[in-house]
Amino acid sequence: MDFPSIKIKDFEGPFDLLLHLIKKNQMDIYNVEISKITNQYLKYIDEMKFMDLEITSEFIVVAATLIEIKSKHLLPKIKKDEEEDEEDQEKNLIEKLILYKKIKKAAEFFKDRYVNSGELYTKKPEIIEEINLTNNNEDIFKNLTLLELYNMYNNLLEIYNNKQNKANVIQKRIYVDKYKIEDKLKYLLGLIENNEVSKFSEIIDKCECKLECIVSFLALLEMVKLKKVRVYQSDSFDNILIERRQDDREE
């Protein structure tokens, strides 16, 4: 049996791999062929020799679940309760897959919004009142002097400016690529080089605006993904602590 070509670095977790295999085999997420998916998934596990053990354990847990479901499919059903347990286990796995797919889609949406945020512009000020047009063909400029015409123009210009809906005009300077994830990544790497443990709140305190805070947080997530640091909290809403990984220090 031919297995699809798999690159370890392409996937962020076991459910990301499962979604890839389901799409690769053109399966419906609500009707997955567990036997076929399990074989391909186990081949992927065999290629994880150089992966971090903490990450590998997540894949192994899902692999064990797939093997158990597959074995129950192959074995004869003795009791009705066993059949129901098998269905519940498979249903639970599918529900987790669907939830992960929704979260991944939402994350991609917000990422696109962030990337395109620097390309948004507001429309020009609108005139609140409509100009009343008449069918009067009378030459209103007849017998007007040049000075009177000039004064009339200034009066109309003043009326126009006063009727602009300036309250809804966003006065904002847009900085294109002022804050880059690559730059923040270098800054954070230098920070953890000199400190055993750093507080994320201290990094945020030095940010000039909300956009810089967001870029700093994305850079931190990238460092976690690259296995450069560990992040943890003592409790919910406590300070996020950043610690350099020991294996990275040895390198």
Curated annotation (Swiss-Prot):
Keywords: Cell cycle, Cell division, Chromosome partition, Cytoplasm. One of its GO terms (biological process) is cell division. It holds the Pfam family SMC_ScpA. InterPro entries: ScpA, ScpA-like_C. GO terms for cellular component: cytoplasm. Gene3D superfamilies: 6.10.250.2410, Structural maintenance of chromosome 1. Chain E. The keyword Membrane does not apply. The keyword Cell division applies. It is found in: Cytoplasm. Belongs to the ScpA family. Component of a cohesin-like complex composed of ScpA, ScpB and the Smc homodimer, in which ScpA and ScpB bind to the head domain of Smc. The presence of the three proteins is required for the association of the complex with DNA. NCBIfam families: PRK00104.1-3. Participates in chromosomal partition during cell division. May act via the formation of a condensin-like complex containing Smc and ScpB that pull DNA away from mid-cell into both cell halves. This is Segregation and condensation protein A. It comes from Clostridium botulinum (strain Alaska E43 / Type E3). The lineage of its organism: Bacteria, Bacillati, Bacillota, Clostridia, Eubacteriales.
